[in-house]
């Protein structure tokens, strides 16, 4: 390496240590450069220091200080952003990007903030959440081709390929780039780092518009009406057969399981939960429930207070 290249490399190293975001800005215009999937993950990993899936607290303060100070042409340090400026900035920033208003930034919210390769951005499905968990379970069954109860790397790659094909972008994506996207999505969503996606991890990659069962009416706050129960039944009985079965039942149980297990459950948990629920309603019909049985389940759920769920 010649002396000029060595000096340039050292300068980048110093910039990284001083302000991680500065390397991603154009030195002339100070605009953010378009990030590759790998660069985006570098930014995420740098600021999500505890690896809990959120940029929050002091991590968020550090990100905002560096994000703002890196836009300045003069080499000011992040510390130049005063606490008062930081609070004002945080308030505006969170109003614009904290979609779920939880006071922290998750990976989807960061993806909306930073300029990224268009194809990679498409994979986050910002404008296209699934209608229901029934749809989710149909997709799960389609891509879990070996019925292992997990979406492995090759199955995830097939899913991402089809997602881009659906968006008519597949011709733009090479096999190498698809592998990069698959690896990146695993880094993002594979919380337990076992190299594959379990149900709860895939549910974060493929969000559902709303888990209807999370509404307060099902948590004992108000009396359940016949209309409430009918609404739930029609939500899951997608084929209007008069019973909730197959992926409809799996989707219903997934939504129920999310109330109990929160963010960490897999296909084995779902199967065990199904067995418990079916035994609880005393049904001998394997893999399907009627309106009456759904009513029993929802009435039981409504009796459980939020404190009991913890």
Curated annotation (Swiss-Prot):
PROSITE patterns named in the record: EF_HAND_1, EF_HAND_2
Binding site for Ca(2+) 1: 48, 50, 52, 54, 59
UniProt keyword annotation of Zinc present: no
Record: residues binding Ca(2+) 4: 190, 192, 194, 196, 201
Binding residues annotated for Ca(2+) 3, in chain numbering: 144, 146, 148, 150, 155
Binding site for Ca(2+) 2: 98, 100, 102, 104, 109
Gene Ontology terms, MF aspect: calcium ion binding
InterPro entries found in the cross-reference section: Calbindin_Ca-bind, EF-hand-dom_pair, EF_Hand_1_Ca_BS, EF_hand_dom, EFh_CBN
Gene Ontology cellular component terms for the protein in this record: cytosol; dendrite; nucleus; synapse; terminal bouton; type II terminal bouton; type III terminal bouton
Tissues expressed in: Expressed in a large number of neuron of the brain and the thoracic ganglion as well as in two small muscles of the thorax.
Binding site for Ca(2+) 5: 237, 239, 241, 243, 248
UniProt key word Repeat: yes
Keywords attached to this entry: Calcium, Metal-binding, Repeat
Residues in EF-hand domain copies: 35-70, 84-120, 131-166, 177-212, 224-259, 283-304
Similarity annotation: Belongs to the calbindin family.
Protein name: Calbindin-32
Annotated organism of origin: Drosophila melanogaster (Fruit fly)
Gene responsible for this protein: Cbp53E
């Amino acid at each position: 390496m010649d002396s000029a290249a060595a000096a340039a490399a050292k300068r980048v190293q110093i910039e990284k240590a001083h302000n991680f975001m500065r390397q991603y800005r154009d030195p002339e215009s100070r605009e953010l450069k378009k990030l590759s999937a790998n660069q985006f993950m570098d930014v995420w990993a740098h600021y999500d220091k505890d690896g809990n899936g959120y940029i929050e607290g002091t991590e968020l303060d550090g990100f905002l200080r560096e994000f703002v100070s890196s836009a300045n042409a003069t080499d000011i340090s992040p510390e130049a952003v005063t606490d008062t400026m930081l609070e004002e900035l945080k308030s505006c920033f969170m109003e614009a990007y904290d979609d779920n208003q939880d006071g922290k930034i998750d990976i989807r919210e960061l993806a909306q903030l930073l300029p990224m390769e268009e194809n990679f951005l498409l994979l986050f499905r910002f404008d296209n959440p699934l209608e229901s968990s029934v749809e989710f379970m149909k997709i799960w069954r389609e891509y879990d081709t070996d019925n292992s109860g997990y979406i492995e790397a090759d199955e995830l790659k097939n899913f991402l390929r089809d997602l881009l094909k659906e968006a008519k972008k597949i011709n733009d994506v090479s096999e190498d780039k698809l592998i990069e996207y698959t690896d990146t999505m695993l880094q993002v969503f594979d919380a337990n780092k076992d190299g594959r996606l379990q149900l709860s991890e895939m549910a974060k990659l493929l969000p559902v518009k709303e888990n209807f069962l999370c509404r307060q009416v099902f948590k004992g706050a108000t009396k359940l009406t016949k209309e409430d129960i009918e609404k739930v039944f029609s939500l899951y009985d997608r084929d209007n057969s008069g019973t909730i079965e197959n992926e409809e039942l799996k989707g219903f149980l997934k939504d129920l399981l999310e109330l109990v297990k929160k963010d960490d459950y897999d296909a084995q948990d779902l199967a065990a939960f199904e067995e418990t629920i079916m035994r609880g309603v005393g049904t001998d019909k394997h893999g399907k429930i009627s309106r009456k049985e759904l009513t029993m389940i929802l009435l039981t759920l409504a009796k459980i207070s939020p404190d009991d769920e913890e």
